[in-house]
Amino acid sequence: MTDTGDRTHPAVERVEAALRAAGVEPRVRWFETATPTAVAAAEALGVEVGAIANSLVFTFDGEPLLVMTSGAHRVDTAFLGERLGGRIRRADADTVRAATGQTIGGVAPVGHPEPLRTLVDEALADYPEIWAAAGHAHTVFPTTFDELLRLTGGEPTPVEGPASAG
C-alpha cells in the first residue's frame, strides 16, 4: 500500500526540491514498509522488476559513480570498468552516504550534495514509466527514461556484458 500523504524526511525533501528545480512536480509515494530492493518495490507497486531504477553507488578510480540500473539487471563491474577505462568497485555505506546524503536502500538519482557522474542502464528505456527511490527506503517516485537522463545528466549505457546478459 502506498500513499502520497504528509510524511517528511530531510533526504526526501532534498529530492523533492531537486525535482522542482528541474521543472518536475514531485510525486513521491511512501510505503508502509521499507522497499530497499527492486523486487520489494516492484511488488509494492505492482510493476515489473525491470521498471525499477536501482540507484547503485560505486567508485570509479576512487571517485563516486552513480549507476542507475534496471531492477532486472546486475551491474557487471568488470564490463563497465573496461568500457570506462578504469576500475569500478561497490561503494561502502559511508561513501554512499557522503556522496548522496542518503542511505543504501533509499538512494535517489537526485538530491545529492554535489552532482554525481551518472550512468543509466539502457534497458530502462524499455519501460514507459520507471520508478526510483526518493531518498528514503520507504519512498519512490515515477519518471521516464528520458527524464531520468535529463535529471541526472546521465550517460545511457549497457550495464551487463554479453556473458552476463541473459
Spans of features found by a protein language model:
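Extended, low-hydrophobicity, polar/charged segments
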Residues: M1-G166
